Amino acid sequence: MVQGVFVTGPPGVGKTTLIVKVTSRLKERGIRIVGFYTVEEREGGVRVGFRLVNVSNGEWRWLAHVNKVQGPMVGKYHVDVNSIEWGLTLLNQEGDLYVIDEVGPMEMKHPSFLRRVEDVVNSRRFLITIHVKMSNWVNSHLNLGSLIRLSYVNRDAAVDEVLNYLRTILNMA
């Protein structure tokens, strides 16, 4: 049974922007949303890190940064595994929709991350973005969610497409 929506696409195509737009519109309708999304941080036009943001209240932690001195490396970034743990604890809250942005190489540095994502996918209504490098994982879970492949061509229309899927899943009129 389909319980949610997976969104994938190349870096920079607008997966997080879609998450922010969709969750904003659902919150206006009284849907309780829990989880997190990831935003990049730039200084002087250069990406220096990523923040993990609580979708409920905007509170955030550093997911990864070029100037951190500890943590496993993904590219030029040191990943803060404690921040990933913080993000995972957000999924323990009660909600109507569980948001995870994203399932990707940085998040996979946490030893329990993928297991926790699978718990959500198997038992909750969800909206999850998937890094293109994780396509094998999402393909094995397509029986539980609809898949939107985001591109520069469809990214604006995809907001309404995702909302339509979620309205059905959430039993909204």
From Swiss-Prot:
Disulfide bonds: none annotated. ATP binds at residues 9-16, 97-104. It catalyses: a ribonucleoside 5'-triphosphate + H2O = a ribonucleoside 5'-diphosphate + phosphate + H(+). Coiled coil: none annotated. Its EC number is 3.6.1.15. GO terms for molecular function: ATP binding; ribonucleoside triphosphate phosphatase activity. Keywords: ATP-binding, Hydrolase, Nucleotide-binding. InterPro entries: Nuc-triphosphatase_THEP1, P-loop_NTPase. Has nucleotide phosphatase activity towards ATP, GTP, CTP, TTP and UTP. May hydrolyze nucleoside diphosphates with lower efficiency. Belongs to the THEP1 NTPase family. This is Nucleoside-triphosphatase THEP1. It comes from Caldivirga maquilingensis (strain ATCC 700844 / DSM 13496 / JCM 10307 / IC-167).
